[in-house]
């Protein structure tokens, strides 16, 4: 459960991401594909090379979903319901992959905003991404 301090940390951190959200989303995906090659199996139709337009487009989708989650932090299940349905019923993404992408997002944010990535912010973002992952896997039944 996100505390009021966690919510403030997440919102403040995401505001600093600003217009770079899509870029960071793509970078995190690229980092995930390189670090955890098995994740590529969900994207057989993508050009996964560095700078790929498809990876950039999907990175923007990831970032947009996270922006929605930040904006609706008190009601993520409703805000992310359609995305949860998509991942559970159509895409059938193994839930462990959300943890892998979350880790890569944290690394990406830490690389771009090292001064702002304090232990408290790190912990808050980690809890937030875990909450998003829980929502996205909630319909896996």
Curated annotation (Swiss-Prot):
- Quick check: keyword Transcription regulation in the entry? no
Where in the sequence is Phosphoserine found? 3, 35, 49, 102, 124, 131, 138
- The PTM N6-succinyllysine maps to 7, 11, 16, 40
Q: Look up keyword Metal-binding and say if it applies.
A: yes
SUPFAM superfamilies, alphabetically? Globin-like (SSF46458)
Phosphothreonine, modified sites: 8, 108, 134, 137
Print the keywords alphabetically. Acetylation, Heme, Iron, Metal-binding, Oxygen transport, Phosphoprotein, Transport
Its cellular-component GO annotations read:
blood microparticle; haptoglobin-hemoglobin complex; hemoglobin complex
Signal peptide, first to last residue? none
Residues with the modification N6-acetyllysine, per the entry, are 16
Q: Which residues bind heme b?
A: 87
Q: Name one GO molecular function term.
A: organic acid binding
Summary of the tissues where the protein is detected? Red blood cells.
InterPro entries, per the entry: Globin (IPR000971), Globin-like_sf (IPR009050), Globin/Proto (IPR012292), Hemoglobin_a-typ (IPR002338), Hemoglobin_oxygen_transport (IPR050056), Hemoglobin_pi (IPR002339)
Can you tell which superkingdom this protein's organism belongs to? Eukaryota
Q: Which residues carry this modification: Phosphotyrosine?
A: 24
Q: Which CDD domains match?
A: Hb-alpha-like (cd08927)
Instruction: Report the SS bond pairs.
Output: none
An example Gene Ontology biological process: hydrogen peroxide catabolic process
Report quaternary structure and partners. Heterotetramer of two alpha chains and two beta chains.
Q: What is this protein called?
A: Hemoglobin subunit alpha
Give the originating organism.
Loris tardigradus
């Amino acid at each position: 459960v996100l505390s009021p301090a966690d919510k403030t940390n997440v919102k403040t951190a995401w505001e600093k991401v600003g217009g770079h959200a899509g870029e960071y989303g793509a970078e995190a995906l690229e980092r995930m594909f390189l670090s955890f090659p098995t994740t590529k199996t969900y994207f057989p139709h993508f050009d996964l090379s560095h700078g790929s337009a498809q990876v950039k487009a999907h990175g923007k989708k990831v970032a947009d979903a996270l922006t929605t989650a930040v904006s609706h932090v008190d009601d993520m299940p409703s805000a992310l319901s359609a995305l949860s349905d998509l991942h559970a019923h159509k895409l059938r993404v193994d839930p462990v992959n959300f943890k892998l992408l979350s880790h890569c997002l944290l690394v990406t944010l830490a690389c771009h905003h090292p001064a702002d990535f304090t232990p408290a912010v790190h912990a808050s973002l980690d809890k937030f991404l875990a909450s998003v992952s829980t929502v996205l896997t909630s319909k896996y039944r």
